[in-house]
Amino acid sequence: MAGAKVAVLKTRPETVIEDYKKLLHMAEYQKFLPKDTRICLKINVSWQIFYPGCSTTPWQLDGVIKTLLEDGYKKENLYGCHNRTVVVDGKIGEVNNKQKQIVVGKYGLENVHLQPEKLSEFKKLVEQGEWIRYEPRGQLLTLHEVFPEGLYIPKRFIGESILHFPTMKTHVFTTMTGAMKNAFGALLHHERHWAHATIHETLVDLLTIQKEIFKGIFAVMDGTFAGDGAGPRAMIPYEKDYILASGDMVAIDAVAAHMMGFDPMSLTFIRLAHEKGLGCGEFKEIEIVGEDVSQVNWHFKDTDNFASRGQKMIYHGLLKPFEKTLLRTRIVPWAYLASRGYYDGVWYPLVGKKRVRQMMQTKWGRLFQEYA
């Protein structure tokens, strides 16, 4: 797609807030985010436990919100946004990851959780008109089949803008995850795991929908910490010191994928989005301003762990014939408990906790500890 631009900067803790301001201006963000509409700050919480590289960083929010306010965006038009998942508690996660402390504590912004604590109360939101059935104008690849009874999205999003806050990390289902995947946790309700079997097509459908309902779309990606391996949780974190921004969700993911060591067009969701004209997935066709990252290659690998292998058996393997029984009936809580039990009860105490302690000794770990 002609005109795709991604801004990339190297940063350090002493300058990261001002570097985010510089980054946003380099990416010409005001062209993508009108000042006369509300802006959903779509925060990423991939785990309620703090784990480096996993979720939106406090300095990412701090630098962007500060810039928005300094550039004349009205405080009342900005709000932090979270969505409920069946395996991650967003309300605990936004505190442990020091996100709420920035959004509410430092800047006093509205902070919205799109779904109630009790998942059984979701039907009330539909009855009250807070979540509405949406019929996309564009052709969808998979979501009509995933949700045959109707596709529901938050009503409040229609006519607003969205600003995504992903991090640079790998993912067991999509190889890498970034701006396009961040919408997965915004537009779909708590049963969005049903879409994992066709996750690549789902991300393309979600970008199609975003372009229909939002007045503006922009993404700011933090790669100060970056995660390699069986993401988005069970990763090996590294200090990488990069931040990225763009109004093209496909292009920013393509640049991030290239930096991690993946061929962007080999990733199905990037290729499909590029082919549909939703953005630019060809690295050589993207205008990169700031750092020259053409030779950057972190040699990240898309790997699996015990939990993800089990999930893939359900979505793509021997257990595929039983997918609906296992994930769409009354016995489904077994899957949530198994996931939480593995990641929270086994992997983190035995593996993850040590890695967090090591990362807390780094410059970004020390900065994280400085945030109250």
Please report, for each region that a protein language model flagged, where it lies by residue.
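N-terminal and secondary-structure boundary signal
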Residues: 1-372
